Structure formats: C-alpha cells, structure tokens
Curated annotation (Swiss-Prot):
Its job: Colony queen number, a major feature of social organization, is associated with worker genotype for Gp-9. Colonies are headed by either a single reproductive queen (monogyne form) or multiple queens (polygyne form). Differences in worker Gp-9 genotypes between social forms may cause differences in workers' abilities to recognize queens and regulate their numbers.
Alphabetized Pfam families for the sequence: PBP_GOBP
Record's keyword terms, sorted: Behavior, Disulfide bond, Pheromone response, Pheromone-binding, Secreted, Signal, Transport
Subunit structure: Homodimer.
N-terminal signal peptide: 1-19
Similarity section: Belongs to the PBP/GOBP family.
SUPFAM superfamilies, per the entry: Insect pheromone/odorant-binding proteins
Organism name: Solenopsis richteri (Black imported fire ant)
Name of the protein in question: Pheromone-binding protein Gp-9
GO molecular function: pheromone binding
Domain of life assignment: Eukaryota
Length: 153
C-alpha cells in the first residue's frame, strides 16, 4: 500500500512539474520558426510572454502596449510561416487541421469549439499583430479553463 501511495505521489509531482514547466515556456517557442521570427522582429526570448502569463491574462496588465504589439508580431510571423495566416487573414480550415494535429483533439472536442470561437472573435481585427496575439491568448485561456474544468470533473 505504501508503494502504491508513493507511486501516486510521484505521478502527481511529475504532472505538477510538467504543468509548471509548460506555463513557464514562451508562447510560440515550440515552433520551428521561433528563432527566425524573433530575429526578424529584433526581439529576444526575454521579450516574449510566457504561456502562463498569457493564459491567465496577466500579459495585458503587466506589459505596455508596445510589448503586446511586438509579441503579437512574433505570433503573426509564426502563423504566417506555417501557412496559417496571410497578412491579417486566417486560413481557418488549415488552422483547424493543424490544431487537431497538434492537440489530438477529435470532432466535437470543446477545444475545437474554443478555437472556432476565438477565430470568430478576432476575425474582423485589422492589425495583424494585435489580432494574432489576441487569438493566441484566447485559445490559451480557453484551454486553461477547459483543463481546470476537466480536473474538477
């Protein structure tokens, strides 16, 4: 019994450490063109918001508008280089396909519904950088809410 409890404790600790590590990662850092987009916008990794900061909405209150815009330009660069965006326009179908591939979400999954809602919410924005950051922030916030609701279930 003690061994079983120890295994559960270790599993919980690893899960917590993994979630903490993910929230400390920088938005977009998992993508191939991350370094290229940072260079194109004369930014360093220190200039980019963390996933935790964006998913909680803290990026909006802790940073100046210029920092928000610059982070958005890096996100737009990543989306454009992956063929998900051209200028300020999304390729919604490709965005859904890539999201499903990346997350393993299945049709009817609430995460896909959240992505659709986030794309709809931001589709009429004209500034490509602000639009990109708002889209990413919307999706990350929705994923955090869904993860919290699934933990409580």
């Amino acid at each position: 019994m003690k061994t079983f409890v120890l295994h559960i404790f270790i599993f919980a600790l690893v899960a917590f450490a993994s979630a903490s590590r993910d929230s400390a990662k920088k938005i977009g850092s998992q993508y191939d063109n991350y370094a290229t987009c940072l260079t194109e916008h004369s930014l360093t990794e220190d200039d980019i918001f963390s996933i935790g900061e964006v998913s909680s909405g803290q990026h909006k209150t802790n940073h100046e508008d210029t920092e928000l815009h610059k982070n958005g330009c890096v996100m737009q660069c990543l989306l454009e280089k992956d063929g998900l965006m051209s200028g300020a326009d999304y390729d919604e179908e490709k965005m859904r396909e890539d999201y499903i591939k990346e997350t393993g979400a299945q049709p009817g999954d609430q995460r896909i519904e959240a992505l659709n809602a986030c794309m709809h919410e931001t589709k009429d924005m004209e500034d490509k950088c602000d639009k990109s950051l708002l889209l990413v922030a919307c999706v990350l916030a929705a994923e955090a809410v869904l993860a919290d609701s699934n933990e409580g279930a």
